[in-house]
UniProtKB/Swiss-Prot annotation:
Note: Monoclonal antibodies to glycoprotein IIb/IIIa, to bovine vWF, and to bovine serum albumin did not show any effect on the binding of AL-B to platelets.
Name listed for the protein in its UniProt record: Snaclec alboaggregin-B subunit alpha
Record GO cellular component, one term: extracellular region
Lineage: Eukaryota, Metazoa, Chordata, Craniata, Vertebrata
GO function terms (MF aspect): toxin activity
Tissue: Expressed by the venom gland.
Signal sequence region: 1-23
Organism encoding this protein: Trimeresurus albolabris
Subcellular location: Secreted
One Pfam family here: Lectin_C
Length: 156
């Protein structure tokens, strides 16, 4: 009886310590901090990929990368799960024309506070580069088709 209580208490402690480590995400999604992430291995244009992500979850968008730590998490998740594809991966960054000014912003509306561009050019949408093991960004034409990653704010 004493051993049962001890083991039960130990399992409870482990469960409680793990439950605060990330977001509560659906079973086929990965979590980092308070967000949920899903790799989608379907080829879509940037616009179609963003639409797909918005249909998967409330406030779902193509992934925004807001810090170096998040960039490392995303790159490692992609490297572990995308081994054979020759395609780059859409992220939620795009160039927006606002009147006569252009600015880059994430599809979820968050500001660009972290950047890891290969070379800026006039193309409007951004991918994570397969050749860099998904650690650098490059802008490409939005009409190209790539696989992509979705992100949404999970529940705690």
């Amino acid at each position: 009886m004493g051993r049962f209580i001890f083991v039960s208490f130990g399992l409870l402690v482990v469960f409680l310590s793990l439950s605060g480590t990330g977001a509560d995400c659906p079973s086929d999604w990965s979590s980092f901090k308070q967000y949920c992430y899903q790799i989608v291995k379907e080829l879509k244009t940037w616009e179609d990929a963003e639409k797909f992500c918005s249909e998967q979850a409330n406030d779902g968008h193509l992934v925004s990368i807001e810090s170096y730590r998040e960039a490392v998490f995303v790159a490692e998740l992609l490297s572990e799960n995308v081994k054979t594809t020759k395609y780059n991966v859409w992220i939620g960054l795009s160039v927006q024309n606002k009147g006569q000014q252009c600015s880059s912003e994430w599809s979820d509306g968050s500001s660009v506070s972290y950047e890891n561009l290969v070379k800026p050019n006039p193309k409007k949408c951004f991918v994570l580069k397969k050749e860099s093991e998904f650690r650098t960004w490059s802008n490409v034409y939005c009409e190209q088709k790539h696989i992509f990653m979705c992100k949404f704010l999970g529940s705690r």
